[in-house]
Amino acid sequence: NGDDFTAEDIVWSWMRVLTPSLGSQYPDMLYYLVGAEDFNTGVITDFSEVGVKALDNKTLEVNLINPTPFFLGLLSHYSTWPVHKETVLKFGEIDDRQGLWTRPGNFVCNGPMNLKSWELNKKIIVEKNPLYWDAEKVRLNEMHFYPVSDINTEERMFRAGQLHLTGTVPSQKCGIWREEGNPNLRIDPYMGTYYYRANVNVKPLDNIKVRKALTYAIDRQKLTEKVTQCGQIPAFSFTPPGAAGYNPETEIPYDPELARQLLAEAGFESTEDFPVLQILYNTSEDHRKIALTIQQMWQQNLGISVELENMDW
């Protein structure tokens, strides 16, 4: 809208993300700042105690709780991006999750594109922002985004020319595209780890030996080569390779024999008394295939029965 973008915009935006009553999904992205977690959890209420301040319009000072080599990488996550304070407060309070500031005609940003229209569950259209600082290098006049829930449908739309870009390729198609050397396929490193979270408040998952047995019984190499098939690499530690300044000292092995030993030490020499486990996964054919494969691995390696349940995410 022509307003200057300043360091103070970032300070206010980060305060908003950390405001407890907003209920932000990713406040922990900023927990590396001094006092950020305490502010978000209500231990302190004065944001000036948090390790971020604007020294002038173009200088931001950040104080971290400890050396964080990947901090600059974290700032590429959208939860850390600035929002326009005046627009947010024009249509509500700092913690208003239903404010109209995100609607077309109201939304103000500092990016190369502006929000033009938003048809819920149909289409989002953004148009070139003439006030963007580097607008002359923005080649596109508009971009259209379509929410497609089925990845196979999305892949067919891409091949039919209805989409110019898709970030999701069905695993069974990705393997074929890789073998063919399809020039439309591009695989880039992704800073993320695919994992299941165990409910440690229920038996027998409250037993660490049971949890270790479950993870040792998963053949990650097979998962990436035979199931996902799109360039993923086995996750032998929680932090993915490529994280600046981090190299895991140990790796999680695939060791069914050790898994069975740990299960016996946990009191399950026979799995007849082991309760049926449930894997809850978000609706997607690829997620279903991974869940099915892990279900089979746990059954074959440990004799454990597993039920699968999907839910929209």
PLM region spans:
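Extracellular/periplasmic solute-recognition and catalytic clefts
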Residues: 116-127, 144-202, 221, 225
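Bilobed periplasmic-binding protein/Venus flytrap-like ligand-binding cleft at the lobe interface
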Residues: 10-14, 62, 143, 210-223
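Periplasmic binding protein-like
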Residues: 2, 164-165, 184, 299-313
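Aromatic- and charge-enriched surface segment that lines or borders ligand/interaction sites
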Residues: 1-26, 61, 157, 204
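Short, well-ordered beta-strand elements
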Residues: 10-13, 60-61, 111-114, 124-125, ...
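Short helices/loops that flank or line small-molecule/ion binding pockets
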Residues: 2-4, 9, 152-162, 179-180, ...
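Gly/Pro-rich hinge or "lid" segments in bacterial periplasmic/extracellular proteins
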Residues: 36, 47-48, 57-58, 63-142, ...
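Append "and occasionally in soluble cytosolic enzymes with long acidic Gly/Pro-rich linkers
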Residues: 127-128, 206-300, 307
